C-alpha cells in the first residue's frame, strides 16, 4: 500500500514455486561456490520450516520464502498467546500432553472448530494495536476471496477501503480518540508500510478488560475478490478489546512492554443473504479443470465436502475417475456441450468422495478464455441429497444410452469388463467376495484403450467403490440360516390344516416345481419353493450366492454323506421335520386313539402295485392260513421328497405309504423289476439307540422301486367267490362297503389328519375299532395279553370280475419274486412272539379295506 493518490489494495501474493530438481552429489570432491552451498542450506531449512506449518500441503507448496517466515512468526506468536491465555504451565502441559493426543486421535474426524466456523455467518478477525492481522479464520476466503495465509501478519489497512481506515483506527484505540492525526497516511512508515503507534499503555492507564467500555460494534468496507461490481463488501464488526498476552515486545530502551490491547471481532456481511444463499452458502464449492476435465484446483469448501486435499485431487489424473460409471456418458455429453457453447448447463451426477462414498452434486461448468482461446474450466457444484439425486436420475432422458449396462458395450463394441459389478442380482460384499470373482476371463487391458477415454477412466477406478456394504455388517452364521428355514417350515405347515382341496392344489404345485427343478438343474435347485419365497430374498440381501447356500446346506442341514444318493440330493431337512418324526416314533399314544379320516386321491401306479400285493397275500394266506405276514417286508415303499415330508407327516405315518404322486392321467405302462436299495434315512438323529428299540430295523429300512406290470388304465374287478384271510387278533370287518369299481376303491383309502393330537375333523368317517390292512407303522406289531380270534373276511361272491382279476395276475412269471422270497422266509415263531401285544394296537391310518398287515 502506498500513500497519496497511488493507493493500492491487497491482492493475491502467493507465487507458484519453481520445480526443484535434486542434483546428484558428485563422486569426487569437486569445488563448489560457497554462496550456493549457503543458499542450498537455507532453502533446506525453509522447506523443513514450511512443513511444520499448520496448513494443507497444497497451500505450503505455493508459499514463497518470505511468506514461510511470516507465517512461522505468526504461528509462534499465536502459540505464545494461548499458552498465557489458557493459564497452563509447562508442567501441566507435559502431564496433559498424552491425554490431549489420545483425544485428538479419538476425535480426529470430528473437526468441531470447522463446524463452528461453518455455522458462523462470517469470519473471526484479531487485529493488534499497530493494525496487524494477528489471526484470521479460514472462512475469510468464503467472503473476501483471500486465503488465510495471505492476510495473516499483514496490515489490515490493505483490506480496508481508504474512506473507512480512519474509523477503523479510531475503533482500535481504547478511548476512541487516537492521539495521532486521523489521516492514516501520516502515521504510516513508508519503509515498512505499517502504522506506528505513538504511545504504549500500561495496565494502570487502561480501564478493566471486562468493562462495557471495551465493546466495539462498527462498520467498514473490506476488499473483496468475489465481488465483480465494486470490489468491496460492507462488513459489520462486533467484538471487544482484550489484552494480547505473551507477545514479549520491547520498547526503544529495551524494556519489556506490557500486553497491549487488540480487537477481537467477528466480521459478518452487512447485507443479509438471500434465502437461497442461506441454504447453499455452506455447500457450494468450485473446482478448476483443464480442457479435458482433469482437475487442477479445488477450494477449501470442496476439500471439506469431498475429503480430498488439493494435491490428492490433482494427482489422480482424469476427472472422469471421480464420476460414477452410470453417469459418465451423461457428463460427457455436458462436457461436449460446454466446449461448443461455453457453458454445460445444470448436470446432476454422482461424485466420488473420500472413503469410497458417492455424493450427488448439481454442477454447472463454464469455459474461461484467455487471449481469445479457451484456457481452463471452472465448475460450480452444489451437493444434493440422495432423494434429490434419485429424482433427477428418474427424470433423466434415456433416449441416449447413458447407462453403462445398456450403452457402454454398444459404443465400444465390447462386452462389459465389470459385469460382476454391474450385475444387479448378487449383492456382494468385501467379506465374501474374493479378488478372483471380480476378474473376468476376458478383461481388456488398459493399453487397449486411449488413456484419455472414458473406458480407460472406468478401468482405472477401484472396484471397491461400487461395493455397497451394509451399515452394520453382522457376520453370517448358521443359526440365522437355520432360524430362517424354521420360519419357512412353520409357514408351510400352516397350510397343512387347510381344506382338502387347497392341500391337493398345493401338493400339485409343489410337485410340478420339483419336476421343473429336476429337469432344469443348476443353482435354482437349491430353492425347491421357487425364488419368490422369503428365504431367497434374505439370501440375496445378505449377498450369499448359490455355492455358499449349497455348502451351508451340506454342513448344517444334511449332516450325512449324500454321495451315494440319487434323488435325495434336494432334501431340505429342517428341525421341525426331524422333531416331528422323532416324536411320532416315540409317542405311543398314536396307537391308542381313534382317528378320523379324510379321503384323498392317490396315484394310480401305487394303487395298482398295492392291489397286486393284496392278491398275492390272498394266495399265501390260502396256502399258510396260520402264518402271519410281516407287514414291514411287504409294504410298497415309495420315495417321498424330504421337503414334502413336513406336510405329509401331518396326514399319515412316517413310512411313506401314500406319497404325493403326480396326478397324471392313467396310462398303460410296464416297468421291470429293480433291485432293492437300502437308505439310512434316520442316521442323523441323535439318541436313536436309546429311544428306538428297533433302531437297526429303522436304519436298514428297505427302499424299493418295484413297479407292477400293467397294460390297462383301469383296474379289473374281482371274481366271485374269492376269499381274503386276515390272520390276526382283535380284527373287525371293514365298515366300508365293498367296491365295485375304481371310484369306490379309491374312496376307501383313508388318510388320518391330526392323529397325534386327536383333533376331530369336520367331514370324517368314524371307525372306533376298525382295523384295516394296507399300511403299517415303523414299530413292529407286538402282541398283548388278550387276544380274541375273529373270522376271516371274504369278498362277496356277487362282485363280478374278481376271478378275472386274479387269473390275470396269478401267473408266476408276473408276480414279484422278491416278495415271494420274503414271505416264504417268515416263520411261525416270530409271529407268535408278537401276538400277545396285538390287543394294544389300534387301527392304523393308511389302510385299504382289502390288504394285509
Swiss-Prot record:
Residue ranges of every copy of the PAS domain listed in the record: 116-179, 273-340
Organism: Rattus norvegicus
Induction remark: Induced or repressed by TGF-beta in a cell-specific fashion. Repressed by dioxin, retinoic acid, and TPA.
Keywords assigned by UniProt, alphabetized: Activator, ADP-ribosylation, Biological rhythms, Cell cycle, Cytoplasm, DNA-binding, Nucleus, Receptor, Repeat, Repressor, Transcription, Transcription regulation
Residue ranges, annotated region (DNA-binding): 37-65
Listed GO CC annotations: aryl hydrocarbon receptor complex; cytoplasm; cytosol; nuclear aryl hydrocarbon receptor complex; nucleus; protein-containing complex
Record's protein name: Aryl hydrocarbon receptor
Chain location of the short sequence motif Nuclear export signal per the record: 63-71
Lineage per the UniProt record: Eukaryota, Metazoa, Chordata, Craniata, Vertebrata
Tissue: Expressed in all tissues tested including brain, heart, kidney, liver, lung, spleen, skeletal muscle and thymus.
Gene name as annotated: Ahr
Notes concerning its domains: The PAS 1 domain is essential for dimerization and also required for AHR:ARNT heterodimerization.
Alphabetical list of InterPro entries matching this protein: AHR/AHRR (IPR039091), AHR_bHLH (IPR033348), bHLH_dom (IPR011598), HLH_DNA-bd_sf (IPR036638), PAC (IPR001610), PAS (IPR000014), PAS-like_dom_sf (IPR035965), PAS_fold (IPR013767)
Domain annotation PAC: ranges: 346-384
Amino acid at each position: 500500500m502506498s500513500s497519496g493518490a497511488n493507493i493500492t489494495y491487497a491482492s493475491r501474493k502467493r507465487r507458484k514455486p519453481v520445480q526443484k530438481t535434486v542434483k546428484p552429489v558428485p563422486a569426487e570432491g569437486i569445488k563448489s561456490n560457497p554462496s550456493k552451498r549457503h543458499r542450498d542450506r537455507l532453502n533446506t531449512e525453509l522447506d523443513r520450516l514450511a512443513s511444520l506449518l499448520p496448513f494443507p500441503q497444497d497451500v505450503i507448496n505455493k508459499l514463497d520464502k518470505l511468506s514461510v517466515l511470516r507465517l512461522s512468526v505468526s504461528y509462534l506468536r499465536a502459540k505464545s498467546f494461548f499458552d498465557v491465555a489458557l493459564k497452563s504451565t509447562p508442567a501441566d502441559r507435559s502431564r496433559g500432553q498424552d491425554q490431549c493426543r489420545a483425544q485428538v486421535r479419538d476425535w480426529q474426524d470430528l473437526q468441531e472448530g470447522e463446524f463452528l466456523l461453518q455455522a458462523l455467518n462470517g469470519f473471526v478477525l484479531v487485529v493488534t494495536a499497530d493494525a496487524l492481522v494477528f489471526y484470521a479464520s479460514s472462512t475469510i476466503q468464503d467472503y473476501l476471496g483471500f486465503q488465510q495465509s495471505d492476510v495473516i501478519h499483514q496490515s489490515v489497512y490493505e483490506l480496508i477501503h481508504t474512506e473507512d481506515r480512519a474509523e477503523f483506527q479510531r475503533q482500535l484505540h481504547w478511548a476512541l480518540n487516537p492521539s495521532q492525526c486521523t489521516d492514516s497516511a501520516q502515521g504510516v512508515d513508508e519503509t515498512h508500510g505499517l502504522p506506528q503507534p505513538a504511545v504504549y499503555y500500561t495496565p494502570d492507564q487502561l480501564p478493566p478488560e471486562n468493562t462495557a467500555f471495551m465493546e466495539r460494534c462498527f462498520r467498514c468496507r473490506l476488499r473483496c475478490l468475489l465481488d465483480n461490481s465494486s470490489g468491496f463488501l460492507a462488513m459489520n464488526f462486533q467484538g471487544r478489546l482484550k489484552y494480547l498476552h505473551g507477545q514479549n515486545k520491547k520498547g526503544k530502551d529495551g524494556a519489556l512492554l506490557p500486553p497491549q490491547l487488540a480487537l477481537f471481532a467477528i466480521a459478518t456481511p452487512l447485507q443479509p443473504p438471500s434465502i437461497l444463499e442461506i441454504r447453499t452458502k455452506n455447500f457450494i464449492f468450485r473446482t478448476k479443470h483443464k480442457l479435458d476435465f482433469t482437475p487442477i484446483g479445488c477450494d477449501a469448501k470442496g476439500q471439506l465436502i469431498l475429503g480430498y486435499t488439493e494435491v490428492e485431487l490433482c494427482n489422480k489424473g482424469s476427472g472422469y475417475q471421480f464420476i460414477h460409471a452410470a453417469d459418465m456418458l451423461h457428463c460427457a455429453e455436458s462436457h461436449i456441450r460446454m466446449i461448443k457453447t461455453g457453458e454445460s448447463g445444470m448436470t446432476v451426477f454422482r461424485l466420488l468422495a473420500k472413503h469410497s462414498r458417492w455424493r450427488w452434486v448439481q454442477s454447472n461448468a463454464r469455459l474461461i478464455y484467455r487471449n481469445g482461446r479457451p484456457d481452463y474450466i471452472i465448475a460450480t457444484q452444489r451437493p444434493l441429497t440422495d432423494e434429490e439425486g434419485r429424482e433427477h436420475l428418474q427424470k433423466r432422458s434415456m433416449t441416449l444410452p447413458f447407462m453403462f449396462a445398456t450403452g457402454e458395450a454398444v459404443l465400444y463394441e465390447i462386452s462389459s469388463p465389470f459385469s460382476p459389478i454391474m450385475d444387479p442380482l448378487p449383492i456382494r460384499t468385501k467379506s465374501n467376495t474374493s479378488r478372483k470373482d471380480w476378474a473376468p476371463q476376458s478383461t481388456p487391458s488398459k493399453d487397449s484403450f486411449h488413456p484419455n477415454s472414458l473406458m480407460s477412466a472406468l478401468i482405472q477406478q477401484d472396484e471397491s467403490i461400487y461395493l455397497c456394504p451394509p451399515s452394520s455388517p453382522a457376520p453370517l452364521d448358521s443359526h440365522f440360516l437355520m432360524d430362517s428355514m424354521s420360519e419357512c417350515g412353520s409357514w408351510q405347515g400352516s397350510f397343512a390344516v387347510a381344506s382338502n382341496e387347497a392341500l391337493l392344489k398345493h401338493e400339485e404345485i409343489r410337485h410340478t416345481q420339483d419336476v421343473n427343478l429336476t429337469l432344469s438343474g443348476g443353482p435354482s435347485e437349491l430353492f425347491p419353493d421357487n425364488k419368490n419365497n422369503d428365504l431367497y430374498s434374505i439370501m440375496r440381501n445378505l449377498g450369499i450366492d448359490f455355492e455358499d447356500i449349497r455348502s451351508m446346506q451340506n454342513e448344517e442341514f444334511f449332516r450325512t454323506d449324500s454321495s451315494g444318493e440319487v434323488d435325495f440330493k434336494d432334501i431340505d431337512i429342517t428341525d421341525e421335520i426331524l422333531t416331528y418324526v422323532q416324536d411320532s416314533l416315540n409317542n405311543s399314544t398314536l396307537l391308542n386313539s381313534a382317528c378320523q379320516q379324510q379321503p384323498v386321491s392317490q396315484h394310480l401306479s401305487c394303487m395298482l402295485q398295492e392291489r397286486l400285493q393284496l392278491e398275492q397275500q390272498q394266495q399265501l394266506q390260502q396256502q399258510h392260513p396260520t402264518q402271519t405276514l410281516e407287514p414291514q417286508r411287504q409294504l410298497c415303499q415309495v420315495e417321498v421328497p424330504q421337503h414334502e415330508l413336513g406336510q405329509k407327516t401331518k396326514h399319515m405315518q412316517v413310512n411313506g405309504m401314500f406319497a404325493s404322486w403326480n396326478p397324471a392321467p392313467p396310462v398303460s405302462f410296464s416297468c421291470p423289476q429293480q433291485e432293492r436299495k437300502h437308505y439310512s434315512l434316520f442316521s442323523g438323529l441323535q439318541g436313536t439307540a436309546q429311544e428306538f428299540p428297533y433302531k437297526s430295523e429303522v436304519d436298514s429300512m428297505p427302499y424299493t422301486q418295484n413297479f407292477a406290470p400293467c397294460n390297462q388304465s383301469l383296474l379289473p374287478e374281482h371274481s366271485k367267490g374269492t376269499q381274503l384271510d386276515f390272520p390276526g387278533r382283535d380284527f373287525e370287518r371293514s365298515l366300508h362297503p365293498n367296491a365295485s369299481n375304481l371310484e369306490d376303491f379309491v374312496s376307501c383309502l383313508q388318510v388320518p389328519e391330526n392323529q397325534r393330537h386327536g383333533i376331530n375333523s369336520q367331514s370324517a368317517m368314524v371307525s372306533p375299532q376298525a382295523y384295516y390292512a394296507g399300511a403299517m407303522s415303523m414299530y413292529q406289531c407286538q402282541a398283548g395279553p388278550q387276544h380274541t380270534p375273529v373270522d376271516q373276511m371274504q369278498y362277496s361272491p356277487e362282485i363280478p370280475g374278481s376271478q378275472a382279476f386274479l387269473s390275470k395276475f396269478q401267473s408266476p412269471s408276473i408276480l414279484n419274486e422278491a416278495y415271494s422270497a420274503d414271505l416264504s422266509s417268515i416263520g411261525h415263531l416270530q409271529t407268535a412272539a408278537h401276538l400277545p401285544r396285538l390287543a394294544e394296537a389300534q387301527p392304523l391310518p393308511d389302510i385299504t379295506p382289502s390288504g394285509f398287515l
